[in-house]
């Protein structure tokens, strides 16, 4: 769509061009189609009522006079014709070939479809009728904000490109720097460019708390800020004078021997900028996600790099049969041990692992391999750091966050966003857009969503499934509406993008489309499954209840897709245990070599490790996730390098002498064919390729025909496949009859007991199993199999 804008003349700060002897100056500003700021005034409560009123009051925007003020990146700048702005379309964008995507995008209009009535959720689940007032209020608030954004910001598409207005943006004339800091009394740009002189480049403030300065190019036409220069903003605030990294900074680094990070003006020469060459893959029918962390992805005890990950780790992910890689800790975080979850610089990729161009080359290589790249994005909270983060940015307790106790997460020691604030919406929506647009990520896994959606943050609360727990006074409606907006934005502009939410509460409508009245995620993490396996592993498997296992795996809301997992990075952290460690414990260190006799503990552990993973994939959801190394039972936990620490509670936690020894992944163990880890890895690979071939996770047909408690046998159908699990510790069953829906001949397509997978080769793979015209377990046909103890076998009809 195109929208019209009107002109205005305002005042602003400008620095005289360097090397010209110029002095104080002023600029004429003109109004453009990209509105600058809205409704975030000093002392504003941040509620949507005040936010909307402030938005309506805004009628002018400040930008320096000139042809281009960085309104669009130089790669795909939208041109102004008269007073109309044509917004390019993403719906048919590709990244194949240098510049192809940008050229195509210029010829199309990007649109986020308008809201509907949001009533379909009541047809999908009539039980929601009892909570119609809450849900309709939620949807009306979403519609109102969409309307305000359309009216005052030119729509979600323009609003989410605010990174082209805030922070540093280069134009043909120079560089404009803008920052929202309503609490500051004065502000100045400081850094290498002016020898950190706070009097050299003072900024001016408008009525909405936005500070700004325009730096003209040098007399010789060169940039007023050289690429790679250190930059900060010095502000006189209610808390005193402080230097802060710009909130919208695109890159930051930690100088050797220093603790706080420095912001870096990042604008490399054209010949250095990475050009994407490969098209982004289409969204697969089912997701098989390999969860990763770049820094700890090396077998060596060190911080790994984007480049090494690109060259060494991506090919192994492809070989293993996964079709998506989820990368943690991309957003800059000054504390490495936070696993990337205490974000300090939201628009900056972590410099520990390399440069932004290195990250782009990683993503492009993944696309070449046909892998989706999902980013583990953190919008649920922010680091409490004041030196290099957003906390206390303008010297106030509020700014981007709630004030008082509501703005502090007592368990995570982090700050909590005020999602009812207009500028918070601008910042976070633009942040999501930035990673998709600039780096070509294919979607997000949103971290800590439960903490966002409830004022109790899901802490010390047990969710029982009662709808009052989801649609009551404990629900942070502003946060839920933000999630609706960000999903609306992502799916409207990038239809192939994937969004996954980490929600432990099971909120109804969470994974239903926004236009139907839902929150809008494509998937929710099926977090109860991993918890169930840990509970079971604390017991003897002789006591496991088959019906209990099946219930946990299949306990999902209709039409709301799930990504399931037996374990993720959470279980691999120090203080917890992986499934392999629960099963085999210290025996893993002494009895995993094939030239040494095994033990009953190892035999049991390897067998159950394979069974747990396959039944989780088979019944647990429409997507599957594995954390790197767990596919082969990685024997070491994760312990980031750290010194001693005293928590706010007063509890003392000893350090590990800043060692990297347990902060790595020993892929060499899974690759070593003389170790039993190799067989476990081979099974996981076969499991992924089986799903790739048969797409059973997303099959419309699922039928669980047997949950036999005495036999410890589970039998179910997914598509045309028949899965047989025998969890009994001793009993193997000959001529065991199982039901099926199709007549014919069945063959083995996956056998956990195969010698290749570290099993005992008790199944004859060449055997053909002919169905009988006799019903069994409420199935019209049946056939007989041999099912050894602690095995899982998958049968498929012979073509």
From Swiss-Prot:
Transit peptide, start-end: 1-57
Major subcellular location class: plastid
Catalysed reaction equations from the record: Transfers a segment of a (1->4)-alpha-D-glucan chain to a primary hydroxy group in a similar glucan chain
Molecular-function annotations in GO: 1,4-alpha-glucan branching enzyme activity; cation binding; hydrolase activity, hydrolyzing O-glycosyl compounds
InterPro entries (alphabetical): A-amylase/branching_C, Branching_enzy, Glyco_hydro_13_cat_dom, Glyco_hydro_13_N, Glyco_hydro_b, Glycoside_hydrolase_SF, Ig-like_fold, Ig_E-set
Domain of life: Eukaryota
Pfam families xrefs: Alpha-amylase (PF00128), Alpha-amylase_C (PF02806), CBM_48 (PF02922)
Cellular location(s): Plastid, Chloroplast; Plastid, Amyloplast
Active-site residues, Swiss-Prot/TrEMBL: 447, 502
Tagged with keyword Transit peptide: yes
Binding site for (1,4-alpha-D-glucosyl)n: 196, 232
Gene Ontology cellular component list: amyloplast; chloroplast; cytoplasm
Enzyme class: transferase
The enzyme's E.C. designation: 2.4.1.18
PANTHER family per the UniProt record, alphabetical: 1,4-ALPHA-GLUCAN-BRANCHING ENZYME, 1,4-ALPHA-GLUCAN-BRANCHING ENZYME 2, CHLOROPLASTIC_AMYLOPLASTIC
Known partners and oligomeric status: Monomer.
Function: Catalyzes the formation of the alpha-1,6-glucosidic linkages in starch by scission of a 1,4-alpha-linked oligosaccharide from growing alpha-1,4-glucan chains and the subsequent attachment of the oligosaccharide to the alpha-1,6 position.
Protein name: 1,4-alpha-glucan-branching enzyme 2, chloroplastic/amyloplastic
């Amino acid at each position: 769509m195109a929208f019209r804008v009107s002109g205005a003349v305002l005042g602003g700060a400008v620095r005289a061009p360097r090397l010209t002897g110029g002095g104080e100056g002023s600029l004429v500003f003109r109004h453009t189609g990209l509105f600058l700021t809205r409704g975030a005034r000093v002392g504003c409560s941040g509620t949507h009522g005040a936010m909307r009123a402030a938005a309506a009051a805004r009628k002018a925007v400040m930008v320096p006079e000139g042809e281009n003020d960085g309104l669009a990146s130089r790669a795909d700048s939208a041109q102004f014709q008269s007073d109309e702005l044509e917004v390019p379309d993403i719906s048919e964008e590709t990244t194949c070939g240098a510049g192809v995507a940008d050229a195509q995008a210029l010829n199309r209009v990007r649109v986020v479809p308008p809201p509907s009535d949001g009533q379909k959720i009541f047809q999908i689940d009539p039980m929601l009728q009892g909570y119609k007032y809450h849900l309709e209020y939620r949807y009306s608030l979403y519609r109102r904000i969409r309307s305000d954004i359309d009216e005052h910001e030119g729509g979600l598409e323009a609003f989410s490109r605010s990174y082209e207005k805030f922070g540093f943006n280069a134009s043909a004339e120079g560089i404009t720097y803008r920052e929202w800091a309503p609490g500051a009394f004065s502000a100045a740009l400081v850094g290498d460019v002016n020898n950190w002189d706070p009097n050299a480049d003072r900024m001016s403030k408008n009525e909405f708390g936005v500070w700004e300065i325009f730096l003209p190019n040098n007399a010789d036409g060169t940039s007023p800020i050289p690429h790679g220069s250190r930059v900060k903003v010095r502000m006189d605030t209610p808390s005193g004078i402080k230097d802060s990294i710009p909130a919208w900074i695109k890159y930051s680094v930690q100088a050797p021997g220093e603790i706080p990070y420095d912001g870096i003006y990042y604008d490399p020469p054209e010949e250095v900028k990475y050009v994407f060459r490969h098209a982004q893959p289409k969204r697969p029918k089912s997701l098989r996600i390999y969860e990763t962390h770049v820094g700890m992805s090396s077998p060596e005890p060190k911080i790994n790099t984007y480049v090494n990950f690109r060259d060494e780790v991506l090919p192994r992910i492809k070989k293993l049969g996964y079709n998506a890689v989820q990368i943690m800790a991309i957003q800059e975080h000054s504390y490495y041990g936070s696993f990337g979850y205490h974000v300090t610089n939201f628009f900056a990729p972590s410099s520990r692992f390399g440069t932004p161009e290195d990250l782009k080359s990683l993503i492009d290589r993944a696309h070449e391999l046909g892998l989706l790249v999902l980013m583990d994005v953190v919008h649920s909270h922010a680091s409490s750091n004041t030196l290099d983060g957003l906390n206390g940015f303008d010297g106030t307790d509020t700014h981007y966050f709630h004030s008082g106790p509501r703005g502090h997460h007592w368990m995570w020691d982090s700050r909590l966003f005020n999602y009812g604030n207009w500028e918070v919406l601008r910042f976070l929506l633009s942040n999501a857009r930035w990673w998709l647009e600039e780096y070509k990520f294919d979607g997000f896994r949103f971290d800590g969503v439960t903490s966002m959606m409830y004022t109790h943050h899901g802490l010390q609360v047990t969710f029982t499934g009662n709808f009052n727990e989801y649609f009551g006074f404990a629900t942070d409606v502003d946060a839920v509406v933000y999630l609706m907006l960000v999903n609306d934005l992502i799916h409207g502009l990038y239809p192939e993008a994937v969004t996954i939410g980490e929600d432990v509460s099971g909120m109804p409508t969470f994974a239903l489309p926004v236009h139907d009245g839902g929150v809008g995620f494509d998937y929710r993490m099926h977090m109860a499954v991993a918890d169930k396996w840990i509970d079971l592993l604390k017991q003897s498997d002789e006591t496991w209840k088959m019906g209990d296992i099946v219930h946990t795996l299949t306990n999902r809301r209709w039409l709301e897709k799930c990504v399931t997992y037996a374990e993720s990075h959470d279980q691999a952290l120090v203080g917890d245990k992986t499934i392999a460690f629960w099963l085999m414990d210290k025996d893993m260190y002494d009895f995993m070599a094939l030239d040494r006799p095994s033990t009953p503990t190892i035999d049991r552990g390897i067998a159950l490790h394979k069974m747990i993973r396959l039944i989780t994939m088979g019944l647990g959801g429409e997507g599957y996730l594995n954390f790197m190394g767990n596919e082969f039972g990685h024997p070491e936990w994760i312990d980031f390098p750290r010194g001693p620490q005293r928590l706010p509670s007063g509890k003392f936690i000893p350090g590990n002498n800043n060692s990297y020894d347990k902060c790595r992944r020993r892929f060499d163990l899974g690759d070593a064919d003389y170790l039993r880890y190799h067989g476990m890895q081979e099974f996981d690979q076969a499991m992924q390729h089986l799903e790739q071939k048969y797409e059973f996770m997303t099959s419309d047909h699922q039928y669980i025909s047997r949950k036999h408690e005495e036999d410890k046998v589970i039998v179910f159908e997914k598509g045309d496949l028949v899965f047989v699990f025998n969890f009994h510790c001793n009993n193997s069953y000959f001529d065991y009859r199982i039901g099926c829906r199709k007549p014919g001949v069945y063959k083995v397509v996956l056998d956990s007991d195969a010698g290749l997978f570290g099993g005992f080769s008790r199944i004859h793979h060449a055997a053909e199993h002919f169905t009988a015209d006799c019903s069994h377990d409420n199935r019209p046909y049946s056939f007989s199999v041999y099912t050894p103890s602690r095995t899982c076998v998958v049968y498929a009809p012979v073509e």
